[in-house]
């Protein structure tokens, strides 16, 4: 092996990872990865705000989420990588793009982790036994447990995510069965008849007009966040070419049944005015039919969803930070890998930031905390847009005969990609129009963009030095945006 080849291998992003995720774990991550508090808890407030037509928003967003996943699937089968779309951004658009999207995605999960630890503590304190325990201690315990699971090995992460996803899926299936029985049998719920007549008696499909439906779109998009995790996880499976197409194609049924189906069923069983923000819509339904233990059971489910989200956040940021650290865009310690194949540096960095959030929560910052939650949506929009842009670049290069697309492809490309980018732009605009929190959230870009720019000038010498050592490669693959540098050996 030449000295140049040795240097390329030394900077390979996948070096040290263990292919430890089992097919059943990846399949369940694909099934339950996007089912979280955005559905179990957030759907209630959105129903109350937008009315029964909310299920259409979930459906439209679901179509674009599927297209984003198909774009990611094509990229993964082009080149499996645990660095996911950060690695692809480097390959197709260069080091600046990888730096920017890597830190934006890190921002997304760091903010989400702060919210998740606080949510876990809040859910635990709904049970009397935990009310005597300070909230920050509960949050710290939750973070310690999930952090430990992530640091041990990828198998432990996969097992925790497998069982968390299973609990969420079983809970939704139980609701779908019971709700369908009430709907099919025309049994009244809380004195109201069920079915389409319920909509006619309460203002129709759009009782609050179409504007609230647009406003809640950003929240629905956030509810779908983490679907891209299946692409990151595919980099740590032995046979991604067999597992990925099945996991991604099954998303159509998942979205139709679990998201669109659940929200439509909720709207057909009770008036939209019966739901309220802060209470799970599933608890509302089961309480109305006399099942008063529903609150405790659903609290277990939303607690599981928050634990799952925290678990996914630590896992994902560890891999993303490792990828950008290998290029010199992040602190060197975030590139460190344990003997068990865990990029612990990035995971620990996220945990430290989450600890800061736990302490901050003690001061009850009010709306500032909501802005933290919304800021994570900016990161996910940036990440999803990057996936689509990279797929469009791959499509263009394939047409030029420079690269070859895999057999598993983004349907209707490139037009589906252009339409998806337009959709993400509309989501950003609707977020900005959601006063005051959404407006302030988008306004934070005035701080974020200069901060990213300043950060780039701090690290660019190191990044370019690493790029020269890589010989213009991403691992063993040429970075088409950075032509190979001629070896001086």
UniProtKB/Swiss-Prot annotation:
Cell compartments where the protein resides: Cell membrane
Transmembrane portions of the chain: 25-45, 49-69, 100-120, 137-157, 162-182, 210-230, 255-275, 289-309, 344-364, 369-389, 413-433, 439-459
Its membrane topology: Multi-pass membrane protein
CC terms in the record's Gene Ontology section: plasma membrane
GO BP terms: amino acid transport; transmembrane transport
Keyword Transport assigned: yes
Keywords: Amino-acid transport, Cell membrane, Membrane, Transmembrane, Transmembrane helix, Transport
Family (UniProt): Belongs to the amino acid-polyamine-organocation (APC) superfamily. Amino acid transporter (AAT) (TC 2.A.3.1) family.
Protein name listed in UniProt: L-asparagine permease 1
Protein's organism: Mycobacterium bovis (strain ATCC BAA-935 / AF2122/97)
């Amino acid at each position: 092996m030449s000295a140049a080849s040795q240097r390329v291998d030394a900077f390979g992003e996948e070096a040290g990872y263990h292919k430890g995720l089992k097919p059943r774990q990846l399949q369940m991550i694909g099934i339950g990865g996007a089912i979280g508090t955005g559905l179990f808890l957030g759907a209630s407030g959105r129903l109350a705000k937008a009315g029964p037509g909310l299920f259409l928003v979930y459906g439209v967003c679901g179509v674009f989420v599927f297209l984003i996943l198909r774009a990611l699937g094509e990229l993964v089968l082009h080149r499996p990588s645990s660095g996911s779309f950060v690695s692809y951004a480097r390959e197709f658009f260069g080091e600046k793009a990888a730096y920017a999207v890597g830190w934006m995605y890190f921002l997304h999960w760091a903010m989400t982790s702060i919210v998740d630890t606080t949510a876990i503590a809040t859910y635990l304190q709904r049970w009397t036994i935990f009310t005597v325990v300070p909230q920050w201690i509960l949050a710290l315990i939750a973070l310690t447990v999930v952090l430990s699971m992530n640091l041990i090995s990828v198998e432990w992460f996969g097992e925790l995510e497998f069982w968390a996803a299973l609990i969420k899926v079983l809970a939704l299936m139980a609701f779908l069965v019971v709700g369908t029985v009430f709907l099919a049998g025309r049994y009244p719920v809380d004195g109201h008849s069920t079915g389409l007549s319920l909509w006619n008696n309460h203002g129709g499909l759009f009782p609050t007009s179409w504007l609230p439906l647009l406003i809640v779109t950003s929240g629905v998009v956030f509810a779908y966040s983490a679907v891209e995790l299946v692409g990151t996880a595919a980099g740590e499976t032995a046979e991604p070419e067999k597992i990925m197409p099945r996991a991604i194609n099954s998303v159509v049924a998942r979205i139709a049944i679990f998201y669109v189906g659940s929200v439509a069923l909720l709207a057909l069983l009770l008036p939209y005015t019966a739901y309220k923000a802060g209470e799970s819509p599933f608890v509302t339904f089961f309480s109305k039919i006399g099942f008063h233990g529903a609150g405790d059971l659903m609290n277990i489910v939303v607690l599981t969803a928050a634990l799952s989200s925290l678990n996914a956040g630590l896992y994902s940021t560890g891999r993303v930070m490792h990828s950008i650290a290998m290029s010199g865009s992040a602190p060197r310690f975030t590139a460190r890998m344990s003997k068990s194949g865990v990029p612990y540096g990035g995971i620990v960095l996220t945990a430290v930031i989450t600890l800061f959030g736990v302490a901050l929560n003690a001061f009850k910052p009010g709306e500032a905390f909501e802005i933290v939650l919304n800021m994570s949506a900016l990161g996910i929009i940036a990440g999803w847009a990057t996936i689509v842009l990279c797929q469009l670049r791959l499509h263009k290069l394939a047409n030029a005969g420079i690269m070859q697309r895999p057999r598993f492809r983004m349907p209707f490309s490139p037009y589906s990609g252009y339409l998806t980018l337009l959709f993400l732009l509309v989501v950003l605009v609707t977020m900005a129009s959601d006063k005051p929190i959404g407006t302030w959230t988008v306004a934070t870009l005035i701080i974020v963009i200069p901060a990213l720019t300043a950060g780039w000038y701090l690290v660019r010498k190191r990044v370019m030095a690493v790029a020269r050592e890589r010989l213009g490669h991403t691992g063993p693959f040429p970075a088409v945006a950075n032509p190979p540098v001629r070896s001086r050996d």
